[in-house]
Amino acid sequence: MKRAIWLVVSFALLTTPVAWAQERPVTIRYLGWSFFLVTTADGVRIAMDPYGNIGYPFPTVEADVVTVSHEHGDHNNVGLVKGSPRVFRGLATGAADWNRFYERFGSTLVYSVAAFHDDVQGTSPRGLNVLFVIVTDGLRIAHLGDIGQPALTDGQLRALGTIDVLMIPVGDGPFTVTIPQASALVAQIRPKVVIPMHYKTPTRQPPTWPGVDERPFLEGKQNVRRLGSHTLTISRDQLPSTTQIVVMEHQ
């Protein structure tokens, strides 16, 4: 009941309007797996889901904020991030409930939306997951963590708001949504830019990990752009008119 109440009530709180600042460029740096560093025009740095020892090199990253969608070792290596960042752990101790975040850093807002890591409302061992949203410089950016829900509720959609840039897992499970479910979530959220994450690469260890690479998700999709870089610089006036999938290289 506690979960149900928070899922219904808090979404309304999270949709408080945010005054957009001047439309200036935001930099999104992809470190690999589900790990991103978002840097605002004012220099606020938000590290999202830093990975542990899964084969990717450990980069030098400094941040002001670290977000952790859930407490699995490939998403919660906060010690990798240098500086003295604020750490937003999406799940409470024991991972049986969500933590709630809605905090401003200058003109940047970072907030959380409760979700599930599975398709049975958190009752499997996979449990809970948190979506993190960054609102800055006229952009709304969402990181779905290890979402396992095949569809979002109306309350979750309201909490997310109109998403411009969406990071979504596309590795076909087994710990996240399937490829058809990922495609359905994109259609439901309707972002301007989709950045695939959490898919198999030659760097990902162990090599027997059962997921797939990004190509099955891209099959049959229109407006796919392979960036050829680990850094995307984007501003609101550069957003495409229809949804574009941007495949980034990991650093």
Regions found by a protein language model. Give the residues of each.
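Positively charged n-region of N-terminal signal peptides that target proteins for export
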Residues: 1-4
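Bacterial N-terminal signal peptides
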Residues: 6-16
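Sec/Tat signal peptide C-region and signal peptidase I cleavage site
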Residues: 17-21
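Core dinuclear metal-dependent hydrolase active-site scaffold
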Residues: 22-65, 73, 86-161, 165, ...
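Proline-aspartate-enriched helix->loop->beta-strand connector
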Residues: 63, 164-168, 179-199
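Histidine-centered divalent metal-coordination motifs
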Residues: 65, 69-76, 80-81, 198
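Extracytoplasmic/secreted cell-surface and envelope-processing proteins
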Residues: 76-77, 150-153, 174-180, 202-209
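Binuclear metal-ion centers of metallo-dependent hydrolases, dominated by the metallo-beta-lactamase
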Residues: 99, 189-251
